[in-house]
Amino acid sequence: LLDGLAAIVRASHVLTDDDSRTFYSTDVFRQADVLAAAVVQPGTVDELQAVLRLCARHQAPTVVRGGGASYTDAYLPVRAGTLTLDMARLTRIDINEADLYVTVEPGVTWAQLYAAVGARGLRTPMWGPFSGLAATVGGGMSHYAVNYGSGLYGVSAESLLGMDVILASGEMLSTGSGGGTNSLPFYRYYGPDLTGLFVGDAGALGVKARMTL
C-alpha cells in the first residue's frame, strides 16, 4: 500500500515518521489514542482520487485533515492502519468574476480565499470560522461551520452551490447544477439537495475535492 501511495504522490509526500504521525493525529484539544499509519499529501485532485481508489482496493480506512483547526475529533484516527489524507497541497482557486462564484480545492484556507477575491475587489459573505482564518474551506463545509459573517448571511454552507466529492470507492460525484453537462452553478436549492448530504459529514460520506461558492 505505501509503495503504491508513493508512486501516486511521490515518496516525499507519504509521511511515516513518528513525529509526523503524532502531529497529524492531534487536533486542537487532544491526541488520538491510535496514531495514523501514514500521512498522505496529494497535490492534485487526480492524485487524491487515485489515492482513494488504492485505499479502496486495500480496504484501508482514511480520515481527512484540512487546516487542523478542528476540535471535534473529526479527523482523528480511531483504529490501527488508518491513513490521514492531508489536504494542505490542494489549494487551487478559480474565480468567476462575471457570475460571482468561486471554485476552490479543499486545502484552501479562508485567509487564502479572502486574499484572492479581495485582490479583485470582491469578498465572500463569510471569511473564516471561529477556529480562525487558517481553517480550510473544506473543513468549514465538513463541519457546517459558523463563520464571521454568519449573523447576516447564515452558516458557511449557505453559500455553497455544489461540489465534486470522491466517494470511498474512488468514484467522483458532482453535485448541484454545475455537475450537469454544459451547465454552470446557480442557486443550490432547486430540486433535491444532494449537495447538502455531504455538508457537515466531517468527510465520512465522501472527500470534498472541489467546492463552488
Residue ranges and their predicted role:
Residues 92-96, 104-106, 110-213:
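FAD-binding subdomain of flavoenzyme oxidoreductases
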Residues 42, 64, 106:
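Conserved strand-loop elements at the edges of beta-sheets that form or border functional pockets
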Residues 17, 62-64:
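Short N-terminal amphipathic alpha-helices
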